[in-house]
């Protein structure tokens, strides 16, 4: 049986991930008129630009849905977001500024929870608004089939009949107006936005051109910190972690992770923290460009990484970061629940995050400009007395100890010099020209 349907399955239940926007509204009504039985499912992901979630299912019913459900995905999204933070599952960075994979995290939650809700209604055909050029078509495909092995996929934007009849936003708006819904297109923006409570993604249209910078974006989770007229005051923030879990902000304890993330968003958003401009490789290897917001995750990640570096040794940190980059790619590719991702994630949560207990105080300024003011943890292995430049009693090692340690280094120094001489004689290194120690040109080996 074909997994992907190229034509509308008339007379059958078809689930649609319904946002209430023009595209999914027109698609739902069109499917109804063509004889399908559309079921609408809307994910509440805490989108910062969504004013009224309850209105969305009501719209779906007006447009012809047999049933419309609002699925609260916020707790699951918060849990997955913290898991990503604990494992450092972020592989896209530019000059140290991070993209926190907020859209891939949202897709992992949406793809599994909506398809699970569809199964409850005996709906085994799923459609959504992703296009064939993007990442989401593959992410939703994977998560959908992982959740329901009997799932078949119908996407209006892969159906030539739909494209011929409603191929653009103007056509879809006219279609809805003629149907009596008086649907008005929103003002055309210079870019497209997708968001959840973890972060926002701005891309496409004018942002496809690299000479259009971040300044054309109107942030939805924080301030436009680059504008001189926007007042941004310095602010000190204290973040507390217990066994890898963020639990308090400025001394206020949160038992609900969703509420903590929302408060972190408010704090970070006042400064424009966590905004980044990234060029990335999509799953199909073509490059795309996005402007991202993630004020809350950025704040939490600053504190988390500070504690990680103060608590764990160098090899553990190296493994955490290497595995985090691998895990970030898997998350981006729609493989967050694959065995190899679970292995990497749970390793970090068990052996890195569980030791992360403490408080970090940060001074936030404009954008990603901040200073760490204090770090406190019962688990710190940072011991200033070990390396103090002042005279201390009961020093952990003496000058004689260091002489012995340095003398042992002679073994590998000699071996390294021999190897460099071999490379020089073989013509792999040019003696004295900066590629190797200049004194090798006087080496007497023949």
UniProtKB/Swiss-Prot annotation:
Residue sites binding L-aspartate per the record: 131, 135-136
Pathway assigned to this chain's UniProt record: Amino-acid biosynthesis; L-arginine biosynthesis; L-arginine from L-ornithine and carbamoyl phosphate: step 2/3
Classification via PROSITE patterns: ARGININOSUCCIN_SYN_1 (PS00564), ARGININOSUCCIN_SYN_2 (PS00565)
Catalysed reactions, as listed in the record: L-citrulline + L-aspartate + ATP = 2-(N(omega)-L-arginino)succinate + AMP + diphosphate + H(+)
EC number(s) reported in the record: 6.3.4.5
Alphabetical GO biological process terms: argininosuccinate metabolic process; L-arginine biosynthetic process; urea cycle
Leader sequence segment: none
Residues engaged in binding L-citrulline: 99, 135, 139, 192, 201, 203, 280
GO molecular function, one term: argininosuccinate synthase activity
Keyword set includes Amino-acid biosynthesis: yes
Family annotation (PANTHER family): ARGININOSUCCINATE SYNTHASE (PTHR11587:SF2)
Family: Belongs to the argininosuccinate synthase family. Type 2 subfamily.
NCBIfam families tied to this protein: argG (TIGR00032), PRK05370.1 (NF003779)
Protein name, entry field: Argininosuccinate synthase
Gene encoding the protein: argG
